[in-house]
Structure formats: C-alpha cells, structure tokens
Amino acid sequence: MTWETARRAIDLAATGKMPFILQFAGGEPLLALPLLRQMADYVRSKRIPARMDLQTNGTLLTEETATFLRRARIGIGVSLDGRPAVHDALRCYPDGRGTAADVVAGIRQLAQCGIEIGLTTVVTADNVAELSGVVEMAYYLGNVRRVGFDLLRPQGRGSAVRSARAEDMAQAMEAVFALNRKLGRMTGHSMAISQMEQAACLAQRTGSGFSHCHAMNGAGVHVDALGNIYACSSFVGDAHFLLGDVERGIDVQRQKEVAQEMQNAMAFCRTCADFSACGGACYARRAGQGHPAASDAECALKRAAMKESLNVAVQCNKRTGQ
C-alpha cells in the first residue's frame, strides 16, 4: 500500500468526524513498518479520533518496533494457535521451521516495553482439542490481558483447512473456561476471554438485530493494498462485495444492499432462541461452506461463552448479595 492510498483511507474514515477503529492487518502489517509510522504520525498530527489496533503474527516484533508501537499507542493482537508444538505445526516459515519461538520472543519484547497484548487463536480441526494450551500460554507469558478464539473462515488459503466440529468446539471451550477459572484462582488474576466479554455485553442490549459483524450493519469496511474498499476482509478480490475505493469513496447504496444480502442469507439465525444474546453468526464463514451447518461450531462457541458469562454473573451477584 502506498502512503497516498493509506492517507486517503484515513481521511475517508474521518469524514464523519466520529471516533472509529483503524485496524492494521494483513498479510503481516509489520512488513510495512515505515508506512505504519506515517499513518500513526498522521492520525496524531491531525488529531483524528481513531483508535489504532494491529494484528500481527508476532515474528517481527523487535525492540525498535515495540518502542514505536508503545509510543504510537497502537493496541496489539498477536496470533498464537496453541502451545509451541501445536503452533509450529500450523504456522511455519517457507523453509519449514516453526515460528513459535520467534513469536514468544516477540511477545517478551513487548513485555519489556510494558505493553499488554491480546492473543488471537484461529480454531481449526487441527488445534481445537488443544485450545486450553492457549490459556496456559497466556498466563505464562504474563503480559496477555485477553484471549480470543476465531473460527476458521474457509476463504483463500483457509479453504484447504478442515473446520472444527461443533461437538469438539463445545468440549474445547468447557476445558478452556475450567482452566481459566483454575489459573485465575491460583494467580488472583482471571484472563479475559473475548467471547465472554461479547456475551456479557449483548446480555445488556435491548435490540435483537445482527451485531456480530460490522459488514452486516454497514458499520465497517476493509481497504486492500490498492485502495479498493470491500464489505469484509474475507472477500477481497470478489467484485460482488466491492463497495468503492479510497479515491471515489463508498457507494452507500451498494453497501446497504450488501449488508441486507448478508442478513437475508443468515435469516435462519433469527429463529434461534439465543439470537438476541448471540448477535448472529459470521456470514463469511457460512458463505465459504455454503450451508447453515457451517455455523454450528460458531454456535457451540458462543453458547459456551454465554453459559460461562452467566455463571460468572451469578457468582458475582452471590458474593455481593444481589
């Protein structure tokens, strides 16, 4: 991505003069570190009301990079798919070497700079049975404040990877929450789980529409390296989901049409008793497999999170006498 494309994207997002989230993802965004510096400086110098977040594979986190990220106040998410052996089997360098050692070294570099992070785990059939290992790693590393589980979306390279089954997902999350409770008692610090936080937030809402996906509400877009704007990062290169570009802006009517199309395709979610507390499943995940059953593992994940969130709320109320 060129600086001119990046600047136009920021200016377009800032047009509404409302706070927004500027998410740097990829590919690997740290490969474009000079551009990230320019973007962060631009946001700060123009006093643009943007929260900046970055999702990285963690292999390029040096002292210099960590210092920049801290000074720029960029939130950091690191991809970690399990304990080192599990991660290495799923994420390798081109020469076949596993990346886990470099990821852990990068996270420790962030810790030395006083930076807390979130861990994101892409869940597949190959690591679903090992998800509790991510929680162990989070406590072990010491500077992890949150863990999130993102089920595979079968587009691009993900189309060749097997998705996790619903029953395996439910069992894995039961183990995750049990271990988190145990380690929380042992350390006096309970790790935040993103899906639990979302469930607790949705439990307080008064509406009942789709809230899982910004694209389904016309509230978020993805800009590719060439400046093309898509409804979702999963559909980059698919003209059907093209909404415009950073030079001409967003076709608002097309954005509404795509959002409605997504909601219509996920209409089966509305018949579920848990819909209001769930917010609906991921359109891209279902589209990649072509049938409603593709959402079963996601449903299992969310139901487990809702159950655990409710249990935590009940225990909290008991302690406070409410």
What is the predicted role of each segment?
Residues 29, 59-60, 83, 124-125, ...:
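Short, solvent-exposed loop/turn segments at secondary-structure junctions
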Residues 84-88, 156-159, 281:
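Short acidic/His/Gly/Ser-rich catalytic and metal-binding motifs that mark active-site loops
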Residues 3-25, 32-152:
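Radical SAM/AdoMet-radical enzyme domain recognition
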Residues 226-228, 264-322:
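Radical SAM enzyme core and accessory elements
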Residues 168-203, 233-279:
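C-terminal accessory region of radical SAM enzymes
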